[in-house]
Amino acid sequence: MNYQKIYNDLISRAQAREPLSEYKETHHIIPRCMGGSDDKENLVELTAREHFIAHAILSKIYPVKSVIFAFFMMCNMKGTKKRHYKVHSKIYAHAKKLNSQFRKGTVISEETRLKMSKSENRSAFNRRNQTQNIGGNQRKG
């Protein structure tokens, strides 16, 4: 399958159409991690679905850590950012597996470990809520 052609066609369609009036996301045509810039010529407005598909295709064309991580993060959105699309379990599993392969063997410095331990996700409020919610919806009886 020619993923580069599919990606180019997706971007060309988005560039040729009228500006979107619905929810839209800005996408770097050439990812910044691969030398792309924030110039107008390198940006395109995509629907949420198109944006997800674009990152899925990019992860097939360029199986490098930063591109895989961007796709994985789109599959794994949590918190205040609401996902405007549904992620199929097979796609999520694929993204998770690729991300895991690239992270394997990564050494985390002591400085980074300290930053992670002090992060907001480990605040007393969050720890208390996590503890209270561990049981989830348990069956009664």
From Swiss-Prot:
Residues 122-141 have a biased composition (Polar residues). It comes from Enterobacteria phage T4 (Bacteriophage T4). Keywords: Endonuclease, Hydrolase, Nuclease. The gene is mobE. The keyword Transmembrane helix does not apply. This is Probable mobile endonuclease E. CDD domains: HNHc (cd00085). GO terms for molecular function: endonuclease activity. Transmembrane segments: none annotated. Residues 115-141 are annotated as: Disordered.
